[in-house]
Protein backbone atom coordinates (compact mmCIF):
# COMPACT_ATOMS: atom_id res chain seq x y z
CA UNK A 1 0.00 0.00 0.00
CA UNK A 2 1.35 3.41 -0.96
CA UNK A 3 1.29 5.88 1.93
CA UNK A 4 0.50 8.74 -0.44
CA UNK A 5 -2.57 6.83 -1.63
CA UNK A 6 -3.76 6.57 1.97
CA UNK A 7 -3.22 10.29 2.51
CA UNK A 8 -5.23 11.06 -0.63
CA UNK A 9 -7.99 8.62 0.30
CA UNK A 10 -7.35 6.43 -2.73
CA UNK A 11 -8.86 2.97 -2.35
CA UNK A 12 -10.99 3.93 0.64
CA UNK A 13 -14.49 2.57 0.97
CA UNK A 14 -17.61 4.10 2.48
CA UNK A 15 -19.24 1.88 5.09
CA UNK A 16 -22.58 3.38 6.15
CA UNK A 17 -21.18 6.88 6.03
CA UNK A 18 -17.82 6.02 7.63
CA UNK A 19 -14.75 6.12 5.38
CA UNK A 20 -12.50 3.07 5.87
CA UNK A 21 -9.10 1.98 4.60
CA UNK A 22 -7.39 -1.35 5.25
CA UNK A 23 -3.62 -1.84 5.10
CA UNK A 24 -1.49 -4.96 5.53
CA UNK A 25 2.08 -5.61 6.59
CA UNK A 26 4.84 -6.95 4.38
CA UNK A 27 6.57 -10.32 4.07
CA UNK A 28 10.17 -9.10 4.30
CA UNK A 29 12.20 -6.19 5.67
CA UNK A 30 15.66 -4.69 5.36
CA UNK A 31 18.30 -5.03 8.07
CA UNK A 32 20.84 -2.89 6.21
CA UNK A 33 19.95 -0.10 3.79
CA UNK A 34 21.88 0.30 0.55
CA UNK A 35 21.58 4.09 0.78
CA UNK A 36 24.76 6.10 0.30
CA UNK A 37 25.90 9.43 -1.18
CA UNK A 38 25.96 8.07 -4.73
CA UNK A 39 22.65 6.22 -4.32
CA UNK A 40 20.41 8.25 -1.96
CA UNK A 41 17.15 6.51 -2.92
CA UNK A 42 17.83 2.81 -3.55
CA UNK A 43 15.24 0.07 -3.62
CA UNK A 44 14.65 -1.72 -0.33
CA UNK A 45 17.26 -4.34 0.54
CA UNK A 46 14.70 -6.91 1.70
CA UNK A 47 16.86 -9.66 3.18
CA UNK A 48 14.92 -10.58 6.34
CA UNK A 49 11.67 -12.52 6.67
CA UNK A 50 9.11 -10.85 8.90
CA UNK A 51 8.11 -12.90 11.93
CA UNK A 52 5.52 -11.31 14.19
CA UNK A 53 5.85 -11.98 17.92
CA UNK A 54 2.55 -12.01 19.83
CA UNK A 55 2.13 -11.75 23.61
CA UNK A 56 -0.77 -11.55 26.03
CA UNK A 57 -0.10 -11.02 29.72
CA UNK A 58 3.60 -11.54 29.16
CA UNK A 59 3.18 -14.99 27.60
CA UNK A 60 3.98 -15.54 23.94
CA UNK A 61 1.08 -16.99 21.97
CA UNK A 62 0.35 -18.14 18.43
CA UNK A 63 -3.40 -17.60 18.23
CA UNK A 64 -5.42 -15.30 16.01
CA UNK A 65 -5.77 -11.92 17.70
CA UNK A 66 -8.21 -9.05 17.15
CA UNK A 67 -8.71 -5.79 19.02
CA UNK A 68 -9.75 -2.24 18.25
CA UNK A 69 -9.46 1.28 19.59
CA UNK A 70 -8.10 4.75 18.93
CA UNK A 71 -4.54 4.62 17.55
CA UNK A 72 -1.86 6.87 19.05
CA UNK A 73 1.88 6.68 19.63
CA UNK A 74 5.19 7.32 17.91
CA UNK A 75 8.92 7.12 18.54
CA UNK A 76 9.86 6.40 22.15
CA UNK A 77 13.04 8.46 21.78
CA UNK A 78 10.80 11.53 21.53
CA UNK A 79 7.83 10.45 23.65
CA UNK A 80 9.99 9.70 26.66
CA UNK A 81 11.24 13.30 26.65
CA UNK A 82 7.68 14.67 26.53
CA UNK A 83 6.33 12.51 29.35
CA UNK A 84 5.25 14.63 32.32
CA UNK A 85 6.04 17.97 30.66
CA UNK A 86 3.66 20.79 29.76
CA UNK A 87 3.41 19.21 26.30
CA UNK A 88 2.04 15.96 27.74
CA UNK A 89 -1.66 15.90 26.82
CA UNK A 90 -2.12 12.12 26.96
CA UNK A 91 -4.41 12.26 30.01
CA UNK A 92 -6.84 14.48 28.11
CA UNK A 93 -6.66 12.22 25.05
CA UNK A 94 -7.30 9.14 27.18
CA UNK A 95 -10.33 10.77 28.77
CA UNK A 96 -11.73 12.01 25.47
CA UNK A 97 -11.54 8.56 23.87
CA UNK A 98 -12.10 6.40 26.96
CA UNK A 99 -15.09 4.70 25.35
CA UNK A 100 -13.04 3.74 22.28
CA UNK A 101 -10.01 2.51 24.20
CA UNK A 102 -6.45 3.22 23.11
CA UNK A 103 -4.07 1.26 20.88
CA UNK A 104 -0.46 2.31 21.38
CA UNK A 105 1.92 2.08 18.43
CA UNK A 106 5.53 2.48 19.56
CA UNK A 107 9.00 2.15 18.06
CA UNK A 108 12.50 3.36 18.80
CA UNK A 109 15.56 4.69 16.99
CA UNK A 110 18.64 5.36 19.11
CA UNK A 111 17.44 3.64 22.29
CA UNK A 112 19.11 0.47 23.51
CA UNK A 113 17.02 -2.19 25.23
CA UNK A 114 17.46 -0.67 28.69
CA UNK A 115 16.44 2.76 27.39
CA UNK A 116 13.35 1.16 25.82
CA UNK A 117 12.46 -0.34 29.22
CA UNK A 118 12.95 3.04 30.90
CA UNK A 119 10.76 4.78 28.31
CA UNK A 120 8.02 2.19 28.83
CA UNK A 121 8.32 2.67 32.61
CA UNK A 122 8.03 6.46 32.27
CA UNK A 123 4.94 6.28 30.08
CA UNK A 124 3.35 3.67 32.32
CA UNK A 125 3.94 5.65 35.51
CA UNK A 126 2.60 8.80 33.87
CA UNK A 127 -0.71 7.00 33.26
CA UNK A 128 -0.35 6.89 29.50
CA UNK A 129 -1.49 3.29 29.21
CA UNK A 130 -4.82 3.84 30.95
CA UNK A 131 -7.65 2.46 28.77
CA UNK A 132 -5.15 0.53 26.61
CA UNK A 133 -6.64 -2.14 24.34
CA UNK A 134 -3.38 -3.34 22.80
CA UNK A 135 0.17 -2.47 21.79
CA UNK A 136 1.74 -2.47 18.32
CA UNK A 137 5.53 -2.38 18.58
CA UNK A 138 7.68 -1.65 15.52
CA UNK A 139 11.12 -3.07 14.85
CA UNK A 140 13.73 -1.11 16.83
CA UNK A 141 16.97 0.04 15.28
CA UNK A 142 18.72 -2.01 17.99
CA UNK A 143 17.04 -5.14 16.57
CA UNK A 144 18.52 -8.32 18.05
CA UNK A 145 20.35 -6.56 20.88
CA UNK A 146 20.58 -8.25 24.28
CA UNK A 147 22.11 -6.66 27.37
CA UNK A 148 22.40 -8.47 30.71
CA UNK A 149 19.54 -10.80 29.81
CA UNK A 150 17.22 -8.08 28.52
CA UNK A 151 16.18 -8.13 24.86
CA UNK A 152 13.84 -5.99 22.77
CA UNK A 153 10.85 -8.17 23.65
CA UNK A 154 11.25 -8.31 27.42
CA UNK A 155 12.04 -4.59 27.43
CA UNK A 156 8.42 -4.00 26.38
CA UNK A 157 6.51 -6.95 27.82
CA UNK A 158 8.05 -6.44 31.26
CA UNK A 159 5.90 -3.31 31.52
CA UNK A 160 2.99 -4.07 29.18
CA UNK A 161 2.20 -7.53 30.57
CA UNK A 162 0.27 -6.23 33.58
CA UNK A 163 -2.43 -4.80 31.31
CA UNK A 164 -3.22 -8.29 29.97
CA UNK A 165 -3.84 -7.00 26.45
CA UNK A 166 -2.28 -8.10 23.14
CA UNK A 167 1.26 -6.93 22.44
CA UNK A 168 2.25 -7.42 18.78
CA UNK A 169 5.97 -7.00 18.17
CA UNK A 170 8.20 -6.60 15.12
CA UNK A 171 5.41 -4.83 13.26
CA UNK A 172 6.15 -3.15 9.93
CA UNK A 173 6.88 0.39 11.07
CA UNK A 174 9.76 2.21 12.68
CA UNK A 175 13.36 2.75 11.66
CA UNK A 176 13.85 -0.53 9.78
CA UNK A 177 11.96 -0.41 6.48
CA UNK A 178 9.44 -0.96 5.04
CA UNK A 179 6.73 0.74 7.07
CA UNK A 180 2.97 0.35 6.95
CA UNK A 181 1.04 3.61 6.62
CA UNK A 182 0.15 4.61 10.20
CA UNK A 183 -2.74 7.04 10.73
CA UNK A 184 -2.37 8.37 14.25
CA UNK A 185 -5.71 9.23 15.83
CA UNK A 186 -7.76 6.93 13.60
CA UNK A 187 -10.15 4.41 15.08
CA UNK A 188 -8.41 1.17 14.14
CA UNK A 189 -9.43 -2.48 13.96
CA UNK A 190 -6.39 -4.74 14.33
CA UNK A 191 -6.26 -8.34 13.17
CA UNK A 192 -3.30 -10.68 13.43
CA UNK A 193 -3.60 -14.06 11.76
CA UNK A 194 -0.55 -16.27 11.39
CA UNK A 195 2.12 -13.81 10.25
CA UNK A 196 -0.18 -11.18 8.74
CA UNK A 197 -1.03 -7.91 10.44
CA UNK A 198 -3.93 -5.89 9.07
CA UNK A 199 -5.12 -2.48 10.20
CA UNK A 200 -8.57 -1.28 9.21
CA UNK A 201 -8.77 2.47 9.70
CA UNK A 202 -12.19 4.01 10.33
CA UNK A 203 -12.06 7.77 9.89
CA UNK A 204 -14.71 8.79 12.38
Model regions: which residues?
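Fold-independent oxyanion-binding glycine-rich loops
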Residues: 3-9, 22, 26, 74-75, ...
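A generic structural signal for short, non-catalytic loop/turn and secondary-structure boundary residues
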Residues: 65, 71-72, 97-99, 130, ...
Amino acid sequence: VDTFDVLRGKGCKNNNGVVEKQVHGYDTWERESLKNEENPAPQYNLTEKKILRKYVGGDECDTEIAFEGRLVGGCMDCLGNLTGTSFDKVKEFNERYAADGIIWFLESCDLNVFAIRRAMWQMDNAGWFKNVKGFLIGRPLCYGQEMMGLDQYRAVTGIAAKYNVPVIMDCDFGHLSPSMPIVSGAYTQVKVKDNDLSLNYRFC
